[in-house]
Amino acid sequence: MALRELKVCLLGDTGVGKSSIVWRFVEDSFDPNINPTIGASFMTKTVQYQNELHKFLIWDTAGQERFRALAPMYYRGSAAAIIVYDITKEETFSTLKNWVKELRQHGPPNIVVAIAGNKCDLIDVREVMERDAKDYADSIHAIFVETSAKNAININELFIEISRRIPSTDANLPSGGKGFKLRRQPSEPKRSCC
């Protein structure tokens, strides 16, 4: 079975639950007292998708303003980006559009974009309507899903949909789909002055 390594970065404001989504996906656990990410953290998980193994190389970036300038370093070369907002905080959805703009300017041209409205278990204090977020995601051709890292809602489904949307690669190429052939150039006849 072929193994593909897929770099995925999580972007979004601080406190939206990026780290909790990663922990739920990788470790199937939830820590309500998880500390904010400083800079970025890295985790991996391999899952089977159709006839391939997809090894997700997950970069969880810090959402604090002081670390925002580092984000392009993490999403360069990414196969996918998950931009997370908190459904209970309208301002996190508003700034999500800035994350998308920055990603479109500095990220790979064919990056798969997913928008995750996290904390969908808190519907009683919802500020962002699901329809508004879905319409925005559709307008930029992004995956859209509402998630709850706390209750394990749509976390695995999010990564399955990313696997589905990432273009397949030629089986003869190394993982990541990037490859080239070396060809020997005919050598010029040797000349001598003597």
From Swiss-Prot:
The keyword Transport is annotated on this UniProt entry: yes
Family matches, as Gene3D superfamilies: P-loop containing nucleotide triphosphate hydrolases (3.40.50.300)
InterPro entries: P-loop_NTPase (IPR027417), Small_GTP-bd (IPR005225), Small_GTPase (IPR001806)
UniProt-listed GO biological process terms: endocytosis; endosome organization; intracellular protein transport; regulation of vesicle size
Effect noted on mutating residue 19 to L: Loss of GTPase activity
Disordered: region residues: 174-194
Protein location: Endosome membrane; Cell membrane; Early endosome; Late endosome
Residues with lipid group (S-geranylgeranyl cysteine): 193-194
Keyword vocabulary terms for this entry: Cell membrane, Cell projection, Cytoplasmic vesicle, Endocytosis, Endosome, GTP-binding, Lipoprotein, Membrane, Nucleotide-binding, Prenylation, Protein transport, Transport
Membrane topology value: Lipid-anchor
Record field: compositional bias (Basic and acidic residues): 185-194
GO molecular function: GDP binding; GTP binding; GTPase activity
SUPFAM superfamilies: P-loop containing nucleoside triphosphate hydrolases
Residues that, per the record, bind GTP: 12-20, 60-64, 118-121, 148-150
Gene Ontology cellular component annotations, sorted alphabetically: actin cytoskeleton; early endosome; endomembrane system; endosome membrane; extracellular exosome; Golgi apparatus; intracellular membrane-bounded organelle; late endosome
Family annotation (CDD domains): Rab5_related (cd01860)
Effector region (motif): residue ranges: 34-42
Pfam family membership, one: Ras
Role: Plays a role in endocytosis and intracellular protein transport. Mediates trafficking of TF from early endosomes to recycling endosomes. Required for NGF-mediated endocytosis of NTRK1, and subsequent neurite outgrowth. Binds GTP and GDP and has low GTPase activity. Alternates between a GTP-bound active form and a GDP-bound inactive form.
Quaternary structure and partners: Interacts directly with ZFYVE20. Binds EEA1. Interacts (in its GTP-bound form) with RABGEF1. Interacts (in its GTP-bound form) with RINL.
Family that this chain belongs to: Belongs to the small GTPase superfamily. Rab family.
NCBIfam families cross-referenced by the UniProt entry: small_GTP
Name of the featured protein: Ras-related protein Rab-22A
